[in-house]
Amino acid sequence: MIPRRSSDITIKTRSDVLPFSGASSRWLQRYAPALLAVALIIAMSISLAWQAAGWLRLQRSPVAVAASPVSHESIRSDPTRLARLFGTSAQDPNAPPPATNLDLVLKGSFVQSDPKLSSAIIQRQGDKPHRYAVGGEISDGVKLHAVYRDRVELQRGGRLESLPFPHRSGGLLASADDITSENDSIEQLQSLQDENAAALRERLDALRQQMEATPIAEPAEEDSSEPTTTPTESD
């Protein structure tokens, strides 16, 4: 009698467990996709929140950003560093050439619309000022290359050198030496003009003498006499 009762109890327990396991499996099959979707959404939300927190940390840290302009300013204030980083800059093509060391003084410049027609008055040491045209030879190996309002350019040994007007040293009032030098320059310019006028007069006189010496051919006189015919009397 006892063994039969124990077997009945065991059978009742299995019958109670089997319906519960079947219901749980059906519930999992029904809601498994929804659970996976919820888990995926939660994971994505956590990832986005982590990225947003990192971005906010970068936006709230101005100390590192403010330190960079200081370094840029220090680089700008030191031209030697720029030269080492980027090398020496090319020279400005419009900049005048270096000043010449020749003993020459620029007295005047005549700038024309055609640069080839420009000229300048230059005085060498111990000599009178002379007027030179562009391309004219001032001394051995030195030629006048270009003429500007404030300077002239000389070609010497294949390179260009600039000869500016002499600068006054001192205040607004000119010294006696400056006044004397200016008077000398004016006299020298006047003498040059007189020489040019004298040369022009000589050329005109020579041309006039040449024209006077050349005989002018007179036109041949036309014979105005008309042939006369002797009238004959008819019988």
Curated annotation (Swiss-Prot):
One GO biological process term: protein secretion by the type II secretion system
Low complexity bias (residue ranges): 226-235
Domain of life: Bacteria
Transmembrane regions listed in the UniProt entry: 35-55
Residue ranges, annotated region (Disordered): 205-235
Cytoplasmic topological intervals: 1-34
Protein's cellular compartments: Cell inner membrane
Recorded topology in the membrane: Single-pass type II membrane protein
Key words, A-Z: Cell inner membrane, Cell membrane, Membrane, Protein transport, Signal-anchor, Transmembrane, Transmembrane helix, Transport
Pfam families in the record: T2SSC
Cellular component, GO annotation: plasma membrane; type II protein secretion system complex
Keyword Cell membrane: yes
Keyword presence, Coiled coil: no
Residues in compartment: Periplasmic: 56-235
Record's function text: Involved in a type II secretion system (T2SS, formerly general secretion pathway, GSP) for the export of proteins. Required for the translocation of a variety of enzymes across the outer membrane.
Protein name: Type II secretion system protein N
Lineage of origin: Bacteria, Pseudomonadati, Pseudomonadota, Gammaproteobacteria, Pseudomonadales
Gene label: xcpP
